[in-house]
């Protein structure tokens, strides 16, 4: 009755709610906020549930934070000297960098043509280990228009991330001691149709063990498309 469209997803941008560049949005999901700011070039802060709901009712949100140009400038230059072979490696990279920059705005250089899903994973990890709501990738994301003049400080902090940092992130996040598993769950953030297709490709001609549950978490629209 109030005009709401229930999406039930942490990735509304995969379900038709895709903000345009410079569009002001109010979302309460940290991984969605960093995606909107970084990949889409929209304007969003990390909202709480009550403030996002208030914005949906009033159509207004406080003008501060990442809604302002001056706060969207990078604080740190991140050099990458690690092999990023899979989407999981981007998660490990984001986890490592997020712990270092906290709530900063990292500028990544040396990243070779990442996919949207890889950037989605990078942003989600940055937002979880730190409080990153915006990042830039040189030559890739819409506001990363070169190093010159795009930093808050005259001499921003330069951070080199090597293979050891990525490996350490895997170690920190992999504390399982048992060799067997009961449940395998993928889809945090929710899987895109490309990620669902990749799982299907990996399982082609194979069967999941009857003692193991495989969960693929995604949105209703993506599931309908996959079906």
What are these regions (language model features)?
Residues 1-12:
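Glycine-rich, N-terminal phosphate-binding loop and its surrounding beta-alpha-beta segment
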Residues 3-5, 29-220:
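Intrinsically disordered, low-complexity segments enriched in small residues
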Residues 12-18, 142, 217-223:
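Short connector loops at secondary-structure junctions
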Residues 18-19, 74:
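Short Asp/Glu-rich motifs
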Residues 19-26:
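Glycine-centered loop/turn motifs
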């Amino acid at each position: 009755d109030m005009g709401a469209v229930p999406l039930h997803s942490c990735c509304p941008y995969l379900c038709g709610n895709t903000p345009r560049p410079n569009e002001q949005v109010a979302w309460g999901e940290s991984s969605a906020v960093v995606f909107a700011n970084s990949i889409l070039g929209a304007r969003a802060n990390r909202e709480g549930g009550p403030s996002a709901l208030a914005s949906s009712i009033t159509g207004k949100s406080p003008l501060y934070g990442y809604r302002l140009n001056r706060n969207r400038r990078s604080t740190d230059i991140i050099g990458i000297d690690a092999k990023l072979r899979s989407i999981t490696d981007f998660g490990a990279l984001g986890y490592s960098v997020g712990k270092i920059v906290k709530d900063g705005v990292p500028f990544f250089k040396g990243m070779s043509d990442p996919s949207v899903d890889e950037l989605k994973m990078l942003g989600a990890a940055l937002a979880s280990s730190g409080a990153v709501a915006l990042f830039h990738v040189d030559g890739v994301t819409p506001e990363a228009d070169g190093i010159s003049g795009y930093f808050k400080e005259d001499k921003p902090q330069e951070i080199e991330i090597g293979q050891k940092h990525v490996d350490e992130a895997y170690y920190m996040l992999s504390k399982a001691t048992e060799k067997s598993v009961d449940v395998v769950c993928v889809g945090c953030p929710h899987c895109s149709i490309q990620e669902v297709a990749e799982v299907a490709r990996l399982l082609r001609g194979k069967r999941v063990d009857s003692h193991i549950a495989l969960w693929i978490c995604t949105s209703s629209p993506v599931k309908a498309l996959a079906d």
